[in-house]
Amino acid sequence: MLIQAFRANGFEADTGEVLKDDIDLFSGKLRMAINQGYGLIVTTGGVGAEDKDHSVEAILRLDHSAAAPYIVKFKRGEGRHRKDGIRIGVGQVGSALLVALPGPNDEVSLCIETLVKGVRAGWSKDVLASMLAKLLRGRLLEKMGHHPAHHCQKHS
């Protein structure tokens, strides 16, 4: 779905491999893609609050000032939550833009139009991350049965 959307919008796009939940492997593969000259690297999945989720942390290893806004916050240590929330990540390493999105197809689909628009317009990583996070927060509230205009908390 992502590959087709990028190609339909004039981008050259390749499918990457499915990676194990290992932060060293993940950040190494991102670095390899950067070194191979990819200008936009989008990952899906691995943005949750469990120990196995490392996508955002891998981007932060490569870009210490990456934008990593929360979609939702949790109390760390409750249930499966080993982190304090679910975040997405948008980083910049040289000319490569790195984006970590959630894995569910409906959430990826929701982000495609904004992602393409932001890349084309040259939005900063902070603006792009903020716009994507806003969309995803709204979707989460919809899934929970809340109307976003009445219950949305701003996270930074």
What are these regions (language model features)?
Residues 1-156:
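Non-catalytic beta/alpha edge segments that cap or flank active sites
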